[in-house]
Amino acid sequence: VAAVTSARRRCRIDVEIAIVRPAHPFMDGCAVRFTFPNGYTGSVIRHSGSYGGSQGLWEIAVMYDGVIVYDTPITDDVLGWQTEEDVKQVLNQIRALPKRAV
């Protein structure tokens, strides 16, 4: 329990725009997902193997229906080496994406 609480503190990103799954330990760091009404999710991770994780920075992936997508105007890959402010900006961009056509 103490390790989980510590991970949550280290992995806190304040965003008031999404349904947030609580941060949970992931590898030797943490992961949190922000899901928006448009069906998209921002998957945010930080651990020693993530892009920028060893420098205390974040990696973010754009997901839809639980799968990473590579065809959004935001990026065609995961975004590494992101500061907390960068993550907030990307999450706002994900929130603004139109729903995907079925």
What is the meaning of each model-derived region?
Residues 2-102:
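Catalytic phosphate/metal-binding cores of nucleic-acid and nucleotide-processing enzymes, i.e., regions
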